[in-house]
Each structure stands twice: as structure tokens, then as C-alpha cells.
């Protein structure tokens, strides 16, 4: 299929998905992917305020700041958002899966969820004072993430802090039992 036809088909598919009031987030959480998701979410919000939106997540995680940008925008909308994990919601992807109101957080049966504490990638260099600033900032970020998991699950702080000490992988059923999900979704008709 020539490139022009592929792009045209992609546009038709994207329009059909948006017409169904669904936003797919199937990539790492970056500034660009977050901006794209926010634009689609607000397009749906402004087109038909208050109408339900389904936010489908399959993400290995990524930028905490970009993820919280999506989180904050969803919380500001009047449209009720339902999150559906399909495949993987790891790291910041798992946090995004919790931006829906209680009762609106689902996963498909074979999905996996991974929670952990935030990390800094790459070599860190700089003056001791700068390193201290970075250390304090990542601890603030860890607290924000712990608070999200606390609010979503109702688990005690000690349980959450222990759970995220290392990568904690869960099946959809395990994530539901832990309080990260409200249910397992077998069909979009069940929403």
C-alpha cells in the first residue's frame, strides 16, 4: 500500500476511534505522547462536554511530569473518564490508569500492571549542592506517587512503600485485589 493510502487509512481509523470517544495511549509517556493525548481528550471534552470518554492504556511508563500533565487535565474535565489497561501499564503508565474516578478503572484479563518508585536515569554529575537538590526532588516525586497509590487503593502507607520499593508486577486479577483496578473488562460493551 503506498504511503499516501496508509496515511489516509490511519486518519480514517483515528477518526473512527475518536468518534467512539476513545483515546488510545500505546507508547512510552513522553512530553509528545502526553501532549497528543491531552489534545485528543480536550477535543472530546469540548465537542460534547460531560459525555463519557474511554482512555485505553498500554504503556511501559516514562516521564513523571508528562504523565502528571495528562492526569491533571483529565481531573479538570467534566466528561467522566474510564481507564482501561490493555497489555501493560507499568511505572507512570500504572499511575495514569488511576486517573479515573473510583468505579471507572479497568483492565483486560491478560494485562499486567507494574508499580515502583521513581528513578533517575543516566549518569548524574554536578556539585554536591545540586545533587542534594535532585535527591530532594525525587523524594518529593516519590511522595506524590505514593499518595496516588494510597488514594486509589486504600492500602496503608507502609504497604504501598514496601510494594514500590522494587518493581512489583501484577496480573489484572492481582491488581484488582490490591485495589489498583475496579474490575476486569471482557468487552467494551460492559462499560
Swiss-Prot record:
Enzyme nomenclature, EC number: 3.4.21.92
Gene Ontology cellular-component terms listed: cytoplasm; endopeptidase Clp complex
Pfam families reported in the protein's UniProt record: CLP_protease
UniProt KW keywords: Cytoplasm, Hydrolase, Protease, Serine protease
Gene Ontology MF annotations: ATP-dependent peptidase activity; ATPase binding; serine-type endopeptidase activity
Reactions listed under catalytic activity: Hydrolysis of proteins to small peptides in the presence of ATP and magnesium. alpha-casein is the usual test substrate. In the absence of ATP, only oligopeptides shorter than five residues are hydrolyzed (such as succinyl-Leu-Tyr-|-NHMec, and Leu-Tyr-Leu-|-Tyr-Trp, in which cleavage of the -Tyr-|-Leu- and -Tyr-|-Trp bonds also occurs)
HAMAP family assigned to the protein according to its UniProt record, in alphabetical order: ClpP
Record note on quaternary structure: Fourteen ClpP subunits assemble into 2 heptameric rings which stack back to back to give a disk-like structure with a central cavity, resembling the structure of eukaryotic proteasomes.
Name of this protein: ATP-dependent Clp protease proteolytic subunit 1
Organism: Chlamydia caviae (strain ATCC VR-813 / DSM 19441 / 03DC25 / GPIC)
Lineage: Bacteria, Pseudomonadati, Chlamydiota, Chlamydiia, Chlamydiales
Annotated gene: clpP1
